[in-house]
A protein has these predicted regions:
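C-terminal cap of metal-dependent C-N hydrolases
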Residues: 64, 76-120
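His/Asp/Glu-enriched, well-ordered alpha-helical/loop segment
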Residues: 1-86, 106
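Short, surface-exposed, polar/charged, turn-prone segments marking secondary-structure boundaries
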Residues: 46-49, 111-115, 127-129
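Short, solvent-exposed cationic patches
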Residues: 122-133
Length: 133
C-alpha cells in the first residue's frame, strides 16, 4: 500500500478481504488514517468504498485473518476488545484519542495525568527528585 493507496479498494472490488497493517511504530498508531486515505483514494479511482468497509480493514478483517474473529474484531457481548473513544471522526487527522481501553481497563485518558502513555523503556525506572515521573 505504500505506493498505490487505492490497492485496498481494488482488491476489495475483486473480492478479497482487506486488512491494513504496518511494521512501523508510528504507522501502527495511525491505521485509522491509513484506512481513510485508502478509502478516499479508492473513491477517487471510482470504486465505491463505504466507511464501514474501511473500518473493517483495521478491525474485523484482521481478526478473521488471525482466526480470532469469534472472540475479537467487533464490539459484541462476550468478545474481547480494545476500544478507542475519539473526539470526532476517526478518519480525520484532526480527531484525537480521548480514552483507550484494553480488555475493559482504562489505559489512557487525555484529561487524566494518571492515565498517560508510558514506554517500556520507562518501566521500573526510578524518578529523579522533583520530576513528575
Amino acid at each position: 500500500m505504500d505506493g498505490i493507496q487505492q490497492n485496498a479498494a481494488l482488491l476489495q472490488q475483486a473480492g478479497a478481504r482487506i486488512t491494513l497493517h504496518s511494521d512501523d511504530p508510528g504507522g501502527i498508531q495511525r491505521l485509522n488514517q491509513e484506512a481513510a486515505k485508502a478509502m478516499y483514494d479508492g473513491r477517487r479511482a471510482g470504486i465505491a468504498v463505504t466507511r464501514d468497509q474501511a473500518l473493517r480493514w483495521i478491525t474485523a478483517n484482521p481478526a478473521w485473518v488471525l482466526g480470532i474473529d469469534s472472540i475479537a474484531g467487533t464490539l459484541e457481548p462476550g468478545k474481547m476488545a480494545d476500544v478507542v473513544v475519539w473526539s470526532g471522526d476517526p478518519f480525520s487527522v484532526y480527531t484525537k484519542a480521548l480514552q483507550v481501553y484494553n480488555d475493559g481497563w482504562l489505559v489512557y485518558d487525555r484529561d487524566d495525568p494518571a492515565h498517560q502513555p508510558r514506554s517500556d523503556f520507562e518501566l521500573n525506572q526510578v524518578s529523579a527528585p522533583g520530576s513528575d515521573r
